[in-house]
């Protein structure tokens, strides 16, 4: 096979890979995509590579302080790079590409600590090893520059959302239901802008609270399953309003944006502390209540910041949970919002591709030396070029 790298209209144009392993820590999603100035992204292939239980356990253990962290982090980073490389080779195979055909690989890494209030965020990955294993330029560590500029370092996807999901006619909200929920508010008048931003001065967004991080943890504890398949465990239960009120009594939910969160706060220890006094509840009722918590916190933030919203488009793992989507629609209606709930597939982008596409796009922005953050979202001092390059 010979290289088919295109000569394109912008120096940064070409094929990029994007890899995303989220807070579920079950594996890595990857996409191969072609970016050309003024055109929508063209997905060439996608892949998913799972993580072994040993790696997943190691990553979960690194979420909290513990012994010998430097050694454990380094070994986990090497193991992650190996799995990321497998995903890249699968993308090369299915897209019929050679490494030289790929301009760069944008990789998020695995968040193990996110503490912007202390001036750091840690996405685990051995980017040098990944470049060695793939022979592709690797662009990594996207969040640190935003944090260095005084921002939250998250969410970073709103700039990409504005690029592909904006509308000239209606205010839209893009809601990512990953381990943590976050929203991007796209006021009417933006519209997709090809490779550029869609009116960054009006784009807003922030993390809302826990989503699959707690939902998955509870179902794994009681059913030994990695996630609530189709929301069926929650559907068997009934929301306990007293427990829901206790869960909602969390200072983060009252905090003003910009704000971001993660497993540093919303983890099994947080949940167990909240469940004190509720041991009598059936596990399925707790699951139903955790699902309602996610819906309520997202709906509260949309009602507070995007009352004119007419459409909510969901991506992330939660997009495959119809019980959660129904709960979100109900919660929005209860707050007086006439907003339809659908997945991003309705806008032409499968929900499982959105975040990996975003990090491919951030790599594209890096090569163009163009900013990748939205400072009104993260609170950074201004827009910045995000990422660090590890050449092939």
UniProtKB/Swiss-Prot annotation:
Residues reported to bind ATP: 22-29
A Pfam family hit: AnmK
Keyword list, A-Z: ATP-binding, Carbohydrate metabolism, Kinase, Nucleotide-binding, Transferase
Entry's EC annotation: 2.7.1.170
Pathway noted in the entry: Amino-sugar metabolism; 1,6-anhydro-N-acetylmuramate degradation; Cell wall biogenesis; peptidoglycan recycling
Catalytic reaction list: 1,6-anhydro-N-acetyl-beta-muramate + ATP + H2O = N-acetyl-D-muramate 6-phosphate + ADP + H(+)
InterPro entries membership: Anhydro_N_Ac-Mur_kinase (IPR005338), ATPase_NBD (IPR043129)
One MF term in the entry's GO annotations: ATP binding
Residue runs in coiled coils: none
A Gene Ontology biological process term: peptidoglycan turnover
HAMAP family: AnhMurNAc_kinase (MF_01270)
NCBIfam families the UniProt entry points to: PRK09585.1-3, PRK09585.1-4
Known function: Catalyzes the specific phosphorylation of 1,6-anhydro-N-acetylmuramic acid (anhMurNAc) with the simultaneous cleavage of the 1,6-anhydro ring, generating MurNAc-6-P. Is required for the utilization of anhMurNAc either imported from the medium or derived from its own cell wall murein, and thus plays a role in cell wall recycling.
Assigned protein family: Belongs to the anhydro-N-acetylmuramic acid kinase family.
PANTHER family: ANHYDRO-N-ACETYLMURAMIC ACID KINASE
The protein's name in its UniProt record: Anhydro-N-acetylmuramic acid kinase
Encoding gene (name): anmK
